[in-house]
């Protein structure tokens, strides 16, 4: 593993100015192209979320603590997608010179906008008091625990650190900073509450998982990787920030979950990310929530049952009978693990 020297003038091949960046074909990175097609096939819109029964659960089935917890989680999510998009639009889209990756980033921006719209719609639906609603919509300024997470992510946008470091940082945002909140909402699904919220959580967590996978894939294209010590420090910082948010400032105890188990789950997610980046585990923590594995399997099954017809309709999943072998890399295969 060749390590990064910040004083070096070396430029990664995927960041070098590329005169062919405006033309897509021929595909030079088929694995990145497949990832883009995979993202394209999972497209959805906020109007698909049925919130019809959520208000009843919100008013009559949730406790004050549960409402407080959910509203603050939604406030963080509503701001975080905008932060991710800020980075994509102002840094990554212009830095990365390969068109296949730009296709993915362009679509990711659209999906993050849908996420942001969905979270804003959820807050708009559940929160009736205007003052409370305004506070949640401005959470990165008004709520300290959310402000701290936002500042961690924002500093990487304007930072002069290497592309590799910033790529890993935003993989940590999507792979670690979202993990505790996603898990807590799945806990509500396990209890049969808030069907609209939990369905949107399924869709969004799937999307963010794919975005994180893409960051890891792009990292493999870098010739000079980060020193393991740099990776460990970044990941530990992100883990501590997420633990403080979901186990202390906004404790999952409020919704009946165990903070110690949640802390372990965050470490498990961090280890999964580190391994995907090509490094050794840091925490060696197992998944304390077996039901999260079951939800993942159910999500994959239900997703395909409901969406395959739509793929065929748009031609995304269709492989022509006469397609040549060298074009097969551009076909979405529906046995991929979402």
Curated annotation (Swiss-Prot):
Fe cation 1 binds at residues 81, 112, 115. Its main location: cytoplasm. Its EC number is 1.17.4.1. GO terms for biological process: deoxyribonucleotide biosynthetic process; sorocarp morphogenesis. The active site is at 119. It holds the Pfam family Ribonuc_red_sm. It catalyses: a 2'-deoxyribonucleoside 5'-diphosphate + [thioredoxin]-disulfide + H2O = a ribonucleoside 5'-diphosphate + [thioredoxin]-dithiol. It is an enzyme of class 1 (oxidoreductase). Fe cation 2 binds at residues 112, 174, 208, 211. GO terms for molecular function: metal ion binding; ribonucleoside-diphosphate reductase activity, thioredoxin disulfide as acceptor. Its cofactor is Fe cation. The keyword Oxidoreductase applies. Binds 2 iron ions per subunit. Keywords: Cytoplasm, Deoxyribonucleotide synthesis, Iron, Metal-binding, Oxidoreductase. It is found in: Cytoplasm. InterPro entries: Ferritin-like_SF (IPR009078), RNR-like (IPR012348), RNR_small (IPR033909), RNR_small_AS (IPR030475), RNR_small_fam (IPR000358). One of its GO terms (cellular component) is ribonucleoside-diphosphate reductase complex. Provides the precursors necessary for DNA synthesis. Catalyzes the biosynthesis of deoxyribonucleotides from the corresponding ribonucleotides. PANTHER family: RIBONUCLEOSIDE-DIPHOSPHATE REDUCTASE SMALL CHAIN, RIBONUCLEOSIDE-DIPHOSPHATE REDUCTASE SUBUNIT M2. Heterodimer of a large and a small subunit. Belongs to the ribonucleoside diphosphate reductase small chain family. This is Ribonucleoside-diphosphate reductase small subunit. The gene is rnrB-1.
